[in-house]
Every structure is written in C-alpha cells, then in structure tokens.
Design a protein with these regions (language model features):
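Conserved PLP-binding active-site segment in aminotransferase class I/II-type PLP enzymes
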Residues: 1-11
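Portal/gating segments that form or line small-molecule/metal binding sites
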Residues: 14
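Conserved PLP-enzyme active-site core in the AAT-like
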Residues: 17-245
C-alpha cells in the first residue's frame, strides 16, 4: 500500500522514486539528514514553516549541523555568500507556511548546483497540481501529505520524492553516505547500485527509516490514496475560493 501511494506521488511530481513518512516533519528531517551529518552546513530560505525552522536551527544544531538563512527572494550574490565549504543542501518551501512568500526555485536551484549540492523543496502548499518543483530545477521534493493531499484531515503523513537528476557520484566527496560502502547494510554503495534515479530514496529507506522508524501506517497511506483521487478537483476549487476572498 505504501509503495503504491509513494509511486503515485512520484508520478504526480515527475520524480523517479519516492517514500512515505509518518509526517511532513519526518519527511523534511529525513531529506536533510540523508545527506547531512555532524559538521555539515545547510543554506535555507528564512521563510519556512516554524516547525521546520526550529528543526533546522535548533534540533539539528544539536547534531552538529549548522544553517544559514537567506531571504526567499535573495539575489544570486546573496545566495553565493551564504555557502561554505561544508554546505551539503539548500532548502526552501514553494509557498511558505504561513507567510505565503514564493520561493525563486530556478535561482535557488541554479546556485545550489553551481556549488555542487541539491535543492530540496517542500511543496506542501501548492501540491503538484499547481507546481512541480522538479520542472524548475529542484532535486528533492517533500510534502506534508496531511494538508491538501489528504484533504480531509483524516491522516497525518509525509512524502519524499527524488527527481533522479542529481549526480551524486559527480560530487562524491560531499556525499560519502551515498558514494562509499554502507557498513550497516552489507557494504552497499547506493549511488553505484541504484544510480542517481534510486540512490537517495533507497538509502533513506534502508538507513533512516530502519533506524528512526518514522514510517507511515498502511491505513494512513490507504486514506491518503483516497484523498489523492480527488486532488485534481479540489485544488482548483481552493484557488477559486482564494480569488473570491
């Protein structure tokens, strides 16, 4: 059940692989921690969900991961200035919760790729009905499926989608967790075994889901799937209501 729903969300976003998590916060944490470790640095938009802001700036700081926040409409020069030698990811939200500021995905992606790191975008608010961040350059997309995807306040959940576009082996020195043998999983090297299309999600499942257990229950995945069936009908109606207000 979980695999079917994850595959459906991957198809909606135009990705190559996906996984479900127990919540949107779990999805964001996994997406970042899958490529960051003690001593890593993250560049993040400052206009993001408060829970995610605290996750990155407070909780992950206790793990030895630091962050530099930038405005969602920062210039290329301002973005460049935020990077360090140990930067491993760039993060932002398509439309921020609750500020509703819009991220310049193309620019953030351009700068992230210039520095050899992926752009992770939380696409909860627009959903792939209104925006597909991968088409604008994002490498990893996350969701709190609790919101519009479920649509009925019935099931908490999250999702991570990999675009399959980021070449981990081309930046092997930055991402040893993906490009060197995993001693906890029979010495497998994810980027070699699964390629850029499947390495990120496979590692996230085999390592983080195994160790942290933030899995979405099959019953919640079943409920989420029901919500996805009407997503294409509900989102235009939400937009109509917003425009009327």
């Amino acid at each position: 059940t979980n695999d079917l729903v994850a595959a459906k969300i991957a198809a909606l976003e135009g990705g190559t692989a996906a996984m479900l998590t127990s919540s949107g916060q779990a999805a964001n944490f996994f997406a970042l921690f899958n490529i960051c470790e003690c001593g890593s640095h993250i560049v993040s938009s400052s206009s993001i969900y408060g829970g995610t802001f605290n996750l990155i700036s407070v909780t992950m700081a206790k793990m030895g991961i630091e962050v530099t926040f930038v405005a969602p409409d920062a210039t290329e020069e301002e973005l460049d200035a935020a990077f360090k030698e140990n930067t491993r990811a760039v993060f932002g939200e398509t439309i921020a919760n609750p500020a509703l500021t819009v991220l310049d995905i193309e620019l953030f992606a351009k700068v992230a790729h210039k520095h050899g790191v992926p752009l992770i975008v939380d696409n909860t608010f627009p959903t792939p009905v209104n925006c597909r961040p991968i088409e604008w350059g994002a490498d990893i997309v996350t969701h709190s499926t609790t919101k519009y995807m479920d649509g009925h306040g019935a099931a908490v959940g999250g999702a991570i989608v990999d675009s399959g576009n980021f070449d981990w082996m081309a930046h092997a020195d930055k991402f040893p967790g993906l490009t060197t043998p995993d001693e906890s999983y029979h010495g497998i090297t994810y980027a070699e075994k699964f390629g850029k299309e499947g390495a990120f999600i496979t590692k996230c499942t085999a390592q983080l889901m195994r160790d942290f257990g933030c899995i979405q229950s099959p019953q919640n995945a079943f409920i989420l799937n029901l919500g996805l069936e009407s997503l294409h009908v509900r989102m235009p109606r939400h937009i109509e209501h917003g425009q009327a207000v």
